[in-house]
């Protein structure tokens, strides 16, 4: 039976939940990966590039280009550097000698900056979905370089942001990590992209975490003994130990955004359209998504029935069991994604 493919370009900072999400995309029969782009985030952009290329090999794939992008945020400001406690120094378990062994060439991207690659690839593939699972710097730079880029993706799926001010950044911030990593980039993207945008926010995981912890074994898919299962077990090992020490599991996050990009109708159980912006000035709220709940905050004085900001779709509940089934299919090699 012929499967209708969903073309994807995935922009990532390449840490443990990213590589599990990337593996899901590489294994899913409905996903066609055009390229990966690496961005700074929980690790350096060089390390992100290396982790993505290593993950491609772990999935027994080749010939998928990886482009290296922004090494710093738009303003090059300091950010939370405590995430190595959760992901490891290299972001995926700190065992570079394990399969697949890190190669020196892993730290080298294709001969083009990621933002330029995004412009070129999506200009030629207007039916492709752009998925971002790291800070939005590469996408913002693409918009700064090419205004028409705002219309190139068929849609943009973002893992990041929040809508009830629930943050996950150390230091008392009310921002989500990816948006906190480059608030200016997040603001540029939400204001200027013209294609449909779907955001999978931090609260989607936070509010349902206890229910999901009780119904899903988030480590079971890592125990098949296959090369991919072993690699992802290694990549998530530090985070799983940290979570277990706090009485919880290392559940899915970036994986939900990639799954949503592959089949939004199947994964997104509930969603809400909201007028939003990103706070750029607050000492505790910088990077937080601000929601116009009354739909009056950014009303257009010259056209009262119009809005100066656009509505963005937020996934507020998702089918974790389908994502878990897909990851079992990926790591076991069963191919049973249906």
Swiss-Prot record:
Its cofactor is Ca(2+). Its EC number is 3.2.2.-, 3.2.2.1, 3.2.2.2, 3.2.2.3. Binds 1 Ca(2+) ion per monomer. It comes from the Eukaryota. CDD domains: nuc_hydro_CeIAG (cd02649). One of its GO terms (molecular function) is adenosine nucleosidase activity. It catalyses: a purine D-ribonucleoside + H2O = a purine nucleobase + D-ribose; guanosine + H2O = D-ribose + guanine; xanthosine + H2O = D-ribose + xanthine; adenosine + H2O = D-ribose + adenine. The active site is at residue 13. It is an enzyme of class 3 (hydrolase). Keywords: Calcium, Hydrolase, Metal-binding. InterPro entries: Inosine/uridine_hydrolase_dom, IUN_hydrolase, Ribo_hydro-like. Ca(2+) binds at residues 13, 18, 133, 254. One of its GO terms (biological process) is purine nucleoside catabolic process. The keyword Transport does not apply. Belongs to the IUNH family. Homotetramer. Catalyzes the hydrolysis of the N-glycosidic bond of commonly occurring purine and pyrimidine nucleosides into ribose and the base, with decreasing activity, in the order: adenosine, guanosine, inosine, xanthosine, cytidine, uridine. This is Nucleoside hydrolase.
């Amino acid at each position: 039976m012929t499967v209708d493919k969903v073309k994807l370009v995935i922009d990532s900072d390449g840490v443990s939940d990213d590589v599990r999400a990337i593996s899901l995309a590489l294994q899913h029969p409905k996903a066609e990966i055009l390229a990966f782009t690496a961005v700074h985030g929980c690790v350096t952009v060089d390390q992100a590039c290396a982790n993505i290329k290593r993950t491609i090999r772990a999935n027994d794939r080749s010939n998928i280009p990886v482009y290296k992008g922004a090494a710093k945020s738009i303003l090059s400001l300091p950010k939370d550097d405590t995430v190595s406690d959760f992901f490891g120094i290299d972001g995926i378990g700190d065992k570079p000698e394990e399969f697949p062994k890190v190669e020196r060439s892993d730290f080298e991207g294709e001969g083009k900056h990621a933002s330029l690659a995004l412009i070129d690839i999506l200009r030629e593939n207007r039916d492709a979905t752009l998925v971002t699972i790291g800070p939005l710097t590469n996408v913002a730079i693409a918009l700064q370089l090419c205004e028409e880029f705002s219309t190139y993706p068929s849609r943009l799926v973002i893992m990041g942001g929040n809508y009830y001010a629930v943050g996950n950044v150390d230091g008392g911030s009310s921002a989500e990590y990816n948006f906190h990593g480059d608030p200016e980039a997040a603001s540029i993207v939400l204001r200027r992209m013209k294609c449909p945008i779907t955001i999978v926010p931090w609260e989607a995981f936070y509010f349902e975490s206890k229910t999901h912890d009780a119904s899903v074994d988030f480590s079971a898919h890592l125990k098949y003994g296959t090369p991919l299962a072993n690699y992802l077990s290694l990549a998530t090992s530090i985070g799983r130990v940290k979570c277990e020490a706090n009485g919880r599991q290392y559940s899915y996050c970036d994986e939900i955004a990639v799954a949503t990009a592959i089949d939004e109708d199947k994964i997104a159980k509930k969603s809400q359209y909201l007028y939003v912006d990103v706070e750029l000035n607050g000492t505790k709220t910088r990077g937080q998504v601000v929601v116009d709940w009354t739909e009056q905050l950014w009303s257009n004085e010259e056209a009262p029935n119009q809005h100066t900001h656009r509505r963005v779709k937020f996934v507020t509940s998702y089918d974790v069991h389908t994502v878990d089934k897909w990851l079992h299919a990926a790591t076991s090699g069963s191919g049973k994604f249906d």
